[in-house]
Amino acid sequence: MTKQNETYPREEKLKAKRLIDELFITGKSVSKYPLRLVYIEVDEEGVPQFQTGVSVSKRYFKKAVDRNYYKRLLRETYRKNKHLLVDQMDKKFAMMLFYQTKDRLNYQEVEHKMKGLFEKFIKQQQATPTESDNQAI
């Protein structure tokens, strides 16, 4: 059994303001309560396959300590389960994960929801033809 790459290096963190702005303007989304994934396809050279950011709204958790806990939880569940995306996808994406509820879910519940969200994202990507596929027809 080979060990999956369960790292979350600096290059994979979504930090570029231009990409984040583009994500909110033209991004598509997939939801699996209480998580939401907003993404865009990236065609740039030298960027990793997935660049990911996380966000927890002040609307749901007033204390920074609570927001930071759920951001840490999202990053950890992404890191442990990103192999589901890497194994299935060959395109590059910039994506943002949102935690959208006041409910205080534990790690196992968030991980289960994250896996469901990734499966939904993969199905959506396999169902949508790309621009290059449309040009070939």
Task: Go through the PLM ranges and name each one.
Residues 1-137:
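Positively charged, solvent-exposed patches that mediate nucleic-acid binding
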